[in-house]
């Protein structure tokens, strides 16, 4: 069983605490692949790309917030912001406040994320998305988030790596998803389920539909 999420490793482990040592992990939207004890693969983002994204958010998206991810830590500028508190207190992230995100410059940035409390995709559409869609893989993750991965790196590419690592064929793989960043994974797995409360594009990408999360559709 593989946990595959946009979340940080520490957050995924907390969610699956009773069986955390029995799982494999795809974290941060496919940029990191792990066993419970070691990293198998990391995909990093060019510094000029994530710094350019950060500068654009500062200059053109004043209503939005952002953070960067490394394999084991997140970095954001305002520890009192709604985004920071949500990541730290609700998702259980290891996240550090820094004065200037661009000046922070950790060596292994794997993902840049834009946040807006209700309409991130719409806020990014006029300027941010056209500017970066050919330099990174951009995907909406709910109404609050736009995740920006290194170009060509997704949940599906991470899962493909694990299939090769374990000797498992795509037709032997079953995936579940609910957001746009799950679509490639849903389209390519031998069997796939979208929860019924997901967006129409996501439901169309899956081979089957399962009940919504509030009915524990995946567990059913």
Model segments located where?
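Conserved acidic, metal-coordinating active-site core of Asp-based
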Residues: 56, 63-176, 180-185, 197
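Hydrophobic packing residues within well-ordered alpha-helices of enzyme cores
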Residues: 12-16, 124, 128, 186, ...
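Active-site phosphate-binding/coordination module
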Residues: 1-84
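Asp-based, Mg2+/Mn2+-dependent phosphohydrolase catalytic module
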Residues: 188, 192, 196-220
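Hydrophobic/aromatic beta-strand patches that form the interior of the parallel beta-sheet core
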Residues: 2, 26, 174-176, 193, ...
């Amino acid at each position: 069983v593989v946990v595959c999420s946009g979340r940080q490793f520490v957050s995924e482990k907390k969610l699956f605490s009773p069986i955390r040592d029995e799982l494999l992990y795809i974290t941060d939207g496919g940029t990191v692949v792990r066993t419970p004890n070691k990293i198998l693969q990391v995909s990093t983002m060019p510094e000029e790309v994530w710094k350019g994204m950060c500068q654009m958010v500062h200059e053109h998206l004043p209503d939005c917030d952002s953070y960067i991810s490394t394999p084991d830590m997140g970095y954001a500028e305002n520890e009192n912001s709604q985004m920071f508190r949500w990541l730290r207190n609700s998702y259980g992230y290891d996240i550090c406040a820094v004065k200037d995100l661009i000046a922070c410059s950790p060596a292994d940035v794997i993902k840049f994320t834009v946040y807006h409390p209700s309409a991130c995709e719409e806020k990014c559409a006029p300027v941010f998305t056209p500017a970066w869609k050919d330099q990174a893989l951009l995907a909406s993750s709910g109404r609050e988030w736009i995740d920006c991965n290194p170009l060509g790196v997704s949940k599906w590419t991470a899962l493909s790596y694990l299939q090769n690592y374990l000797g498992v064929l795509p037709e032997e793989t079953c995936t579940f998803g609910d957001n746009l960043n799950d679509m490639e994974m849903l389209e390519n797995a031998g069997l796939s389920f979208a929860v019924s409360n997901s967006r129409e594009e996501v439901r169309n990408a899956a081979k089957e539909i399962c009940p919504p999360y509030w009915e524990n559709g995946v567990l059913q």
